[in-house]
């Protein structure tokens, strides 16, 4: 459950702890703005992304389906700083059972909009698709830049973290996996 009042109090305390005056003109509304922002960027905590995959269609298609370059924005749970990038989702329908393409993007967003680790995010997307659609295989790749590596600490802007989760036929069959990676890279 989202507690806007508690977040506002916490932001006020942080501002005081860094030596700022939360009552000065530029900061007066900041605790409320931050609370509203957190409600938006952590909205995935209020949903079950699997629900986006309830609608399944029967099609004469048992070949690879890829939705690539899905923009994603999340918050690293270690420093509460953003990471952002792209998700690529591939699956091979079993017996022609497909879902709407936008539903795959909604699953990505539902898991991204919460405190996250990129590795977990990648697996959660793949496991949810595998569980709900029961496809022959699923492959998820996420490429993201982490502000905790860009803005602080090691300060390496432009560095990207790439994670993958490979399930079913994509894990078992090297050629199928290679085809998916090639299509994701745009080398079809």
UniProtKB/Swiss-Prot annotation:
It comes from the Bacteria. It is an enzyme of class 3 (hydrolase). Zn(2+) binds at residues 76, 79, 148. Pathway: Cofactor biosynthesis; 7,8-dihydroneopterin triphosphate biosynthesis; 7,8-dihydroneopterin triphosphate from GTP: step 1/1. Its EC number is 3.5.4.16. One of its GO terms (biological process) is tetrahydrobiopterin biosynthetic process. InterPro entries: GTP-CH-I_C/QueF (IPR043133), GTP-CH-I_N (IPR043134), GTP_CycHdrlase_I (IPR001474), GTP_CycHdrlase_I_CS (IPR018234), GTP_CycHdrlase_I_dom (IPR020602). Keywords: GTP-binding, Hydrolase, Metal-binding, Nucleotide-binding, One-carbon metabolism, Zinc. Pfam families: GTP_cyclohydroI (PF01227). It catalyses: GTP + H2O = 7,8-dihydroneopterin 3'-triphosphate + formate + H(+). One of its GO terms (molecular function) is zinc ion binding. Gene3D superfamilies: 1.10.286.10, 3.30.1130.10. GO terms for cellular component: cytoplasm. Belongs to the GTP cyclohydrolase I family. Homomer. This is GTP cyclohydrolase 1. It comes from Pelotomaculum thermopropionicum (strain DSM 13744 / JCM 10971 / SI).
């Amino acid at each position: 459950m989202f507690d806007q009042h508690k977040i506002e109090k916490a932001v006020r305390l942080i501002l005081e702890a860094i030596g700022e005056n939360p009552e000065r003109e530029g900061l007066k509304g900041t605790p409320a703005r931050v609370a509203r922002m957190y409600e938006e960027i952590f909205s995935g905590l209020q949903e079950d992304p699997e629900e986006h995959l309830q609608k399944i269609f029967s099609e004469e298609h048992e070949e690879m389906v890829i939705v690539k370059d899905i923009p994603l924005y999340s918050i690293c749970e270690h420093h509460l700083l953003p990471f952002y990038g792209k998700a690529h989702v591939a699956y091979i329908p079993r017996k022609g059972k497909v879902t709407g393409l936008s539903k795959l993007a909604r699953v990505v967003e539902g898991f991204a909009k919460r405190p996250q680790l990129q590795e977990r995010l990648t697996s959660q997307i793949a496991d949810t698709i595998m569980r709900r659609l029961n496809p022959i295989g699923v492959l998820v790749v996420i490429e993201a830049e982490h502000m905790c590596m860009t803005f602080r600490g090691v300060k390496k802007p432009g560095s990207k973290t790439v994670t993958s989760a490979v399930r079913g036929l994509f894990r078992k069959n090297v050629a199928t996996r290679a085809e998916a990676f090639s299509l994701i890279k745009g080398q079809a």
